[in-house]
Amino acid sequence: MPSPLGLPDFIALAGGRDWLQARGAAGIQPLLAEADCSVLAVLHPGQALSSATIARRVGWSPAALEPVLSRLESAGAVDKTPGGAHRVNPALVPRGSVFALEAKVKDWQKAVLQGRAYRSWADNYVVLLGEVGQVAVRRAAERVSHDGAGLYSSSGWVVRPRARRPAPAKRLWGFEHLYAATACSVPAL
């Protein structure tokens, strides 16, 4: 799956099957621009916000925000109330956890570096190791544990990933890339 940063070997969506189905049923094209996700991430489905509040929360000028809001409204991602406030389409609120999996036969250090980059948008990463020695497994486990990430070797789980969340806008950006990948192919669920 092409992601916001890098190309993980595998992606796992845990507990988000209903989100993926609702996202597809919404009929909204994937929103892959980081700016779009920055705006959407400050919106809520149940609470409409004024343009001024959105601009302040995103850190943009109202002039920079208006074309993005207009585009998102045209796409069906944002609803505008009769009073001029905005709320996000509920189908765009991520549910579940996305894990980026990086498989390496030997170079666990490269897998950890790649996994750390994926954590900018994924809930966490897991390194999948092939047949390596005990010293390599121990060193990889130390690095991965420090990150709160996961390590899986040929003998099973060495370190299980801990729950974490990236910044809301980056997380939404990752979920939108996941949706784009599944909209173009049939994922293994």
Descriptions of predicted regions:
Residues P2-P4, G16-S38, A55, H86-N89, ...:
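Non-catalytic C-terminal interaction segments of nucleic acid-processing enzymes
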Residues R23-A41, S50, E102-S154:
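Catalytic cores of nucleic-acid endonucleases
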Residues L40-V42, Q47, R71, V93:
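N-terminal targeting/trafficking signals and adjacent low-complexity tails
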